[in-house]
């Protein structure tokens, strides 16, 4: 073994970044990386390289390490396990001392953990599968601007999922016609409607016009139904100043909720979360762009990690998968996402892709959003897989209804209430779901038409991101 202080290049494992006897501290930030080393690179060296390059190391020995307590600041790869049934891949467990990170900064956390290692030549591929964020670090963050409980109290809606829809077509409508869609959907029975991720302020519909017509629709629908309604006004823009201007205008109009896209960046998300809490406005996050780095199983960042970062950052909603819809969503993996967002205390469960216990230290939960290819005929499956604290967004499943938008909203509301009633009466609603829907449809033409239109539509493709311990393709 080379002397740690010999000039030149020394293997990372021999510089202290591989420590199989290390016992992680309660205050350490722990990471589970899926590593695919280049041929001839031992997994221990690959894990040590990730630890080194994401903490204190560079490619050669530097004498200035002696000016620090380098053993304290070095990340330590303390375990490397082979991935079951996947030759050439390992899970490397790495511990980082809490002193390596600035308090309450997702930008600093991510710059360290994922900032410089994903293009590292000794690795063919690298994926951050999970993190354990210690209570000591969790408590430095604001967390969700409101959280699940406060949102329900704000809206006065309890005991069932929240219903929503994305306005379609998402591009091309004038502001007036856009507002008409919002009104019909809310009047028909939905709780929320929303802008989609790429509606900002385009030539066909400027943001101020959209906000005015949407809030007119919200107010009229509230007056007609006696229920609190909302429309996710997307305030995403090119600068923080412009986002604040749009958000402030939304608040002045009385909107209960605004929306941002994941693409605005972590610091902007935290800034908007602070604004949302200060202004008593719910904050919805669309996970636009996440699939570019979360979907592939061997390289990138798992969405369960993004879920943890966004809970810390302070959003109230985030899209988290449907299981039965058109987008990627293995049942067990999706359950892990939902647990991460909603639960106060989470136990490691490899069947859900959860590598660590996680304590949230009373930080409020984030309301998951299920959207993309779902319809009223799947209501029993959605409640079974996703539970009660979820927002179910039926965009095409509302606006594509043959009888019109209001009828589409009515069909979804009737299906939901029939399923919740059956659940509350002790009926096995998952097993009896089709019969429950059929019975409800016999008394409601809108639901009957929805079932006739979409009843046989499914998206049963095998998921790319499944837990390694069990083979669980999407199966609805």
Curated annotation (Swiss-Prot):
Binds 1 Mg(2+) ion per subunit. Its EC number is 4.1.1.39. Induction: Transcription is 27-fold up-regulated by growth on H(2)/bicarbonate compared to pyruvate, RuBisCO activity is induced by growth on H(2), H(2)/bicarbonate, formate, methanol and CO. PROSITE patterns: RUBISCO_LARGE (PS00157). It holds the Pfam family RuBisCO_large_N. Mg(2+) binds at residues 194, 196-197. The keyword Cell wall biogenesis/degradation does not apply. The record marks 326 as: Transition state stabilizer. The modification N6-carboxylysine is found at residue 194. It catalyses: 2 (2R)-3-phosphoglycerate + 2 H(+) = D-ribulose 1,5-bisphosphate + CO2 + H2O; D-ribulose 1,5-bisphosphate + O2 = 2-phosphoglycolate + (2R)-3-phosphoglycerate + 2 H(+). Keywords: Calvin cycle, Carbon dioxide fixation, Lyase, Magnesium, Metal-binding, Monooxygenase, Oxidoreductase. GO terms for molecular function: magnesium ion binding; monooxygenase activity; ribulose-bisphosphate carboxylase activity. One of its GO terms (biological process) is reductive pentose-phosphate cycle. Its cofactor is Mg(2+). Substrate binds at residues 116, 166, 170, 287, 319, 371. The active site is at 168 (proton acceptor), 286 (proton acceptor). It is an enzyme of class 4 (lyase). It comes from the Bacteria. The basic functional RuBisCO is composed of a large chain homodimer in a 'head-to-tail' conformation. In form I RuBisCO this homodimer is arranged in a barrel-like tetramer with the small subunits forming a tetrameric 'cap' on each end of the 'barrel'. RuBisCO catalyzes two reactions: the carboxylation of D-ribulose 1,5-bisphosphate, the primary event in carbon dioxide fixation, as well as the oxidative fragmentation of the pentose substrate. Both reactions occur simultaneously and in competition at the same active site. Belongs to the RuBisCO large chain family. Type I subfamily. Heterohexadecamer of 8 large chains and 8 small chains. This is Ribulose bisphosphate carboxylase large chain. It comes from Pseudonocardia dioxanivorans (strain ATCC 55486 / DSM 44775 / JCM 13855 / CB1190).
